[in-house]
Amino acid sequence: MEKFTVHTGVVAPLDRENVDTDAIIPKQFLKSIKRTGFGPNAFDEWRYLDHGEPGQDNSKRPLNPDFVLNQPRYQGASILVTRKNFGCGSSREHAPWALQQYGFRAIIAPSFADIFFNNCFKNGLLPIVLTEQQVDHLINETVAFNGYQLTIDLEAQVVRTPDGRDYPFEITAFRKYCLLNGFDDIGLTLRHADKIRQFEAERLAKQPWLNNKLVG
């Protein structure tokens, strides 16, 4: 998992409340057994004018010119600012996969759905909770200024604006540690690989029958 320390990026505003996971990545794209390839279908039903299906050549599909992420000024955005209850609806880890593979490193909102919030951390996507007033300011500034950028300093736990404001945010020490070091669940486990191998060796020495193969 990629480390998150300090990130500066272009901001895109998604001025909608209650954006659910089916809007983030529609259900027909959940059939894949891979964890990659979801970025082109993030917000598929809002992003394109036609109905999307797995395996399509998305470069040939008609774009919805009214959807905010299709506007030229927000191309390459890596920070999404949106409204409350983002990521609600059904539980699907594909939602943070799609957002991350689109190019987002962080999502800022007044609140998130719990399961989506947890899934973000497991996949290196940083969800940041700010007040509604702070989100209002960021959305207004993003709309007013082309190429509006924010800096997110995870170590300091602040969002820095171009006009010199620092918006602090909360994150648990464990989640912060994992993001700063790029550790997902597998990475955390592998840090203890030597102890796991030692435990297995000691267990088999004490209980050798556990190593016997079953015969039919």
From Swiss-Prot:
Chemical reaction(s) catalysed: (2R,3S)-3-isopropylmalate = (2S)-2-isopropylmalate
GO function terms (MF aspect): 3-isopropylmalate dehydratase activity
Quaternary structure and interacting proteins, as annotated: Heterodimer of LeuC and LeuD.
NCBIfam families tied to this protein: leuD (TIGR00171), PRK01641.1 (NF002458)
Keywords, alphabetical: Amino-acid biosynthesis, Branched-chain amino acid biosynthesis, Leucine biosynthesis, Lyase
Example of a GO biological process term: L-leucine biosynthetic process
Name of protein: 3-isopropylmalate dehydratase small subunit
Its biological purpose: Catalyzes the isomerization between 2-isopropylmalate and 3-isopropylmalate, via the formation of 2-isopropylmaleate.
